Design a protein with these regions (language model features):
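N-terminal small/polar loop signature for handling phosphorylated ligands or for N-terminal nucleophile
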Residues: 51-114, 210-265
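An N-terminal, well-structured beta->alpha segment
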Residues: 1-67, 74, 157-184, 195
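Phosphate-binding and adjacent anionic-ligand microenvironments
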Residues: 247, 251-253, 274, 294, ...
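Conserved phosphate/anionic-ligand binding catalytic regions in large, soluble enzymes, centered on
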Residues: 2-22, 107-108, 191-203, 259, ...
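Short acidic, glycine/serine/threonine-rich loops at helix termini
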Residues: 61-66, 91-95, 113-119, 148, ...
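Gly/Ser/Thr-enriched, mixed-charge loops and adjacent short helices
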Residues: 2, 6, 115-240, 245-246
Length: 528
């Protein structure tokens, strides 16, 4: 663990807990905190405050206290949550308490031996340019001997239930938009040993959903995540205990949140009386359609946000409601940033394919709590009309076009793996792809060089995005293939998207098979 240092990147820091500069410990987190303290003290003339939250991971509480030691030692006022809290609540507290910076200690859905350090700025969103690079420079200039751990207790304020109460109130007021009989809707919920174990039931109950069944074995916070292989609600295995309970109680919906409760997974009862897992794109389609359908007097002063690798169907939904649609790079921080970048417009909602969704701007990051409430709102309204969420999704396909996506991740471990990922990206960058499953290529976007090349007339346009290692191929029929290396794991990710018209519910199975075959053909073209 001494051969290289654990580095602080644009998304913060994530690594294995242990001794040494290549591990998560009080010194590596202390170095981050000293650098951020230096930046705050240099760039602000008034006394600033920070807020610190942490999830259920092993050693999170001790590490959070050590982070508080360093901030307070540097004369910065600290608000520290007294126990584990969801990441969206940290974003909320940052805005509410008018802090300059927020820190959450979490490693999302990584294995139990990991922990991480995520940084939020005064708007409530994750750090973005130019602040991210400035913080990295400050942190890199800190030596371990520069870190001051001398806690100033008079500057450390523990936060107990007040922020919870306000967050619950605001989540309900923003998410409770349906008109159904909520007490008839049967919900199974698992926090997968994470931070939503108390707050999500309180939000659902407060909104009127009283028929709630919690997976008891997974309702206790546990940094070892003993009942699952991975605490990731994208993985069917993580929801298997919840689905078993759903079968036993005949539930309408299954909700699972990841350890820091920013991402949510859903399984819903279909027409065969089985539970279907929704992917992140499908969830985003359902929530966006429902939220927009409940709003009156929409126009282009309102906008919704998404990312370059998420379903293009969202754009069709936005256009049909006459609201503006904005797209950012992969990562939810770019959706949060839109709210700052377009102050004259009103943000309604936004989402990405990786199971993250945000409703309103009262938080500035993905929020599993409010998203789960809206999912129950649309689900219970469907139930009162005698349909289920799969029917609702198919209705969306009929209205806006049937879009189907598939993500394939290829793992390449170690130093050799990094080289291989780089080589795959370069091959794709220089490839002379002419078509996608027989449909003529019309556009190639390279976000690393910020260029889009029109494949019909050879025209080159500049892309108005920060540079990022993402490639997107698009053909005449709207088929797209995107490729990018993962920011947090040794993987390269391929996103396939195909679409066609769906005329009726009866046609769904047949057309679904056509799109599945199309995806199989594409994966073969890209050597899978």
């Amino acid at each position: 663990s001494f051969y290289k240092n654990l580095s602080f990147g644009t998304g913060g820091m994530r690594g294995i807990v242990g001794i040494g500069p290549n591990r998560v410990n009080r010194y590596t987190f202390g170095k981050n905190t000293q650098g951020i303290s230096n930046f705050i003290n240099k760039s602000s003339s008034k006394k600033e405050s920070v807020v610190i939250a942490y999830d259920c991971r092993n050693q999170s509480k001790e590490l959070a206290n050590q982070v508080a030691d360093v901030f307070s030692s540097n004369g910065i006022n600290v608000y520290l949550f007294s126990s584990i809290r969801p990441t969206p609540e940290l974003s909320y507290a940052l805005i509410k308490l008018k802090c300059i910076c927020g820190i959450v200690l979490t490693a999302s859905h990584n294995p139990p031996e990991y922990n991480g350090y995520k940084v939020y700025w005064k708007d409530g969103g994750q750090i973005v340019p130019p602040v991210d690079k400035k913080l990295i420079d400050e942190i890199n200039s800190v030596k371990f001997t520069d870190i001051s751990f001398k806690r100033n207790n008079s500057l450390v304020n523990l936060i107990d239930t007040q922020i919870d109460t306000d967050f619950i109130h605001d989540s309900i007021s923003i998410g409770k938009i349906g008109v159904s009989k909520r007490e008839d809707y049967r919900i199974v919920f698992t926090p997968i040993h994470g931070t939503s174990y108390k707050i999500l039931p309180e939000v659902l109950n407060g909104a009127g959903f009283k028929n709630l069944h919690i997976v008891k074995e997974q309702a206790v916070p546990d940094g070892n995540f003993n009942t699952v292989k991975s605490p990731n609600p994208e993985e069917p295995e993580a929801l298997s205990m919840a689905i078993d309970l759903a079968k036993a109680v005949n539930a309408d919906i299954v909700i699972g949140t990841d350890p820091d409760a920013d991402r949510v997974g859903l399984a819903v009862k279909n027409n065969k009386n089985e539970y279907s897992l929704l992917n992140g794109n499908q969830m985003m389609i359902i929530l966006t359609e429902f939220i927009l359908s409940k709003r009156k007097n929409l126009n282009k002063s309102f906008f919704i946000g998404s990312t370059v690798v998420s379903t293009a169907m969202i754009k069709n939904i936005a256009e049909s409601y006459n609201v503006d649609f904005k797209v950012g790079l992969t990562g939810f921080k770019w959706i949060g940033k839109m709210i700052n970048d377009f102050p004259s417009q009103n943000f309604i909602c936004g989402g990405e394919e990786s199971y993250g969704y945000m409703v309103g701007d009262f938080v500035r990051d993905k929020d599993a709590i409010t998203s789960a409430l809206v999912a129950c709102e649309v689900g219970s309204e469907c139930k009162s009309m005698g349909i289920n969420l799969i029917d609702y999704l198919i209705d969306c396909y009929i209205k806006y076009g049937f879009f189907k996506e598939k993500l394939i991740s290829v793992e390449k471990k170690g130093a050799e793996g990094l080289k291989e990922i780089s080589s795959i990206m370069n091959k794709l960058r220089n490839s002379k792809i002419k078509s996608l499953d027989g449909s003529k290529l019309i556009s190639f976007k390279d976000f690393q060089s910020s260029l889009e090349i029109n494949q019909i007339n050879g025209k080159i346009n500049n892309l108005d995005f920060p540079k990022s290692n993402v490639l997107i191929f698009e053909s005449e029929d709207g088929t797209t293939v995107a490729a990018r290396p993962s920011g947090t794991e040794p993987k390269i990710k391929f996103y396939f998207s195909v679409n066609t018209i769906l005329k009726s519910k009866e046609d769904y199975e047949r057309v679904n098979q056509i799109l599945n075959n199309k995806i199989v053909n594409l994966t073969k073209e890209f050597n899978f």
